[in-house]
Amino acid sequence: MKIILANPRGFCAGVDRAISIVELALEIHGAPIYVRHEVVHNRFVVNGLRERGAIFVEELDEVPNGAIVIFSAHGVSQAVRQEAKERNLKVFDATCPLVTKVHMQVARASRKGTKAILIGHEGHPEVIGTMGQYDNDKGGIYLVEDVEDIAKLTLRNDEDITFMTQTTLSIDDTAGVIEVLKQKYPAIQGPRKNDICYATTNRQQAVRELAKLSDLVIVVGSKNSSNSNRLAELASRMGVTAKLIDDANDIEVSWLDNVTVIGLTAGASAPEILVQSVISRLKELGVDKVEELEGCEENTVFEVPKELRIKEVE
């Protein structure tokens, strides 16, 4: 048996930045540091930060007045920002800049009173935060997950309408939804460039190539990670057995029956250390060769807030 590694895989720039913000806040200010929602959707990462003194909460009422709080990479609503301000919380914002870009699109629509349609998964924290950028009773924001939801929309064609998307969606599914949306509302406006982020796009393309070569695709990522789920779904749609695992302990020996080539990748919030532990476990189970696809190079870097940049000693 051999493993073929997808490339790129694992951490994206937004996740790197979010984790660095928590680590630097702990280093500079000391524990406890409060984090609203899991900073990224990965159990290993969250547990590691918790051990270092990060306290993860779902709502700000769990944070003492005046404390330091970090907003997760998924972003928050304007109401959450206002609550933090009113309670004098010291905020470090780990919202991915590419999510912030979508927030700005929604805020612009809100200011103009333009009706906004967000394509995304109901209940996902990124979607909740993005919907929460709209604050204009003269307009409105509407969530659609699939083409069936579009049929339920009752907006008129003579209204100003714009759309935007969650950043971690399936490229193929979203393209289909946008096509139907444009058929129903021919004058609808949208972003010049797709809101699905570069990392989601690159990792899905890498899995597309990986699935062509594999008998089994293993995706390292947590069950609540949107982009990790999309990778497993994509491989499965291409006719390959796909498994989403948190770590090497989730691997079942029976998966390897009649398998010659294992494709291995990781979601954007899964660290490389987990990939390496999976490789080690698979070697114990008979893998004797590891290859890596060439893939595309990623060089995107997002800076942490200036208050957290540690100056080098001269």
Swiss-Prot record:
This is 4-hydroxy-3-methylbut-2-enyl diphosphate reductase. One of its GO terms (biological process) is terpenoid biosynthetic process. Its cofactor is [4Fe-4S] cluster. Catalyzes the conversion of 1-hydroxy-2-methyl-2-(E)-butenyl 4-diphosphate (HMBPP) into a mixture of isopentenyl diphosphate (IPP) and dimethylallyl diphosphate (DMAPP). Acts in the terminal step of the DOXP/MEP pathway for isoprenoid precursor biosynthesis. One of its GO terms (molecular function) is 4-hydroxy-3-methylbut-2-enyl diphosphate reductase activity. (2E)-4-hydroxy-3-methylbut-2-enyl diphosphate binds at H41, H74, H124, T167, S225, S226, N227, S269. It comes from Histophilus somni (strain 2336). The active site is at E126 (proton donor). Pfam families: LYTB. Belongs to the IspH family. It catalyses: isopentenyl diphosphate + 2 oxidized [2Fe-2S]-[ferredoxin] + H2O = (2E)-4-hydroxy-3-methylbut-2-enyl diphosphate + 2 reduced [2Fe-2S]-[ferredoxin] + 2 H(+); dimethylallyl diphosphate + 2 oxidized [2Fe-2S]-[ferredoxin] + H2O = (2E)-4-hydroxy-3-methylbut-2-enyl diphosphate + 2 reduced [2Fe-2S]-[ferredoxin] + 2 H(+). Transmembrane segments: none annotated. Signal peptide: none annotated. Keywords: 4Fe-4S, Iron, Iron-sulfur, Isoprene biosynthesis, Metal-binding, Oxidoreductase. Its EC number is 1.17.7.4. CDD domains: lytB_ispH. [4Fe-4S] cluster binds at C12, C96, C197. It is an enzyme of class 1 (oxidoreductase). Pathway: Isoprenoid biosynthesis; dimethylallyl diphosphate biosynthesis; dimethylallyl diphosphate from (2E)-4-hydroxy-3-methylbutenyl diphosphate: step 1/1; Isoprenoid biosynthesis; isopentenyl diphosphate biosynthesis via DXP pathway; isopentenyl diphosphate from 1-deoxy-D-xylulose 5-phosphate: step 6/6. Binds 1 [4Fe-4S] cluster per subunit. InterPro entries: LytB/IspH. Isopentenyl diphosphate binds at H41, H74, H124, S225, S226, N227, S269.
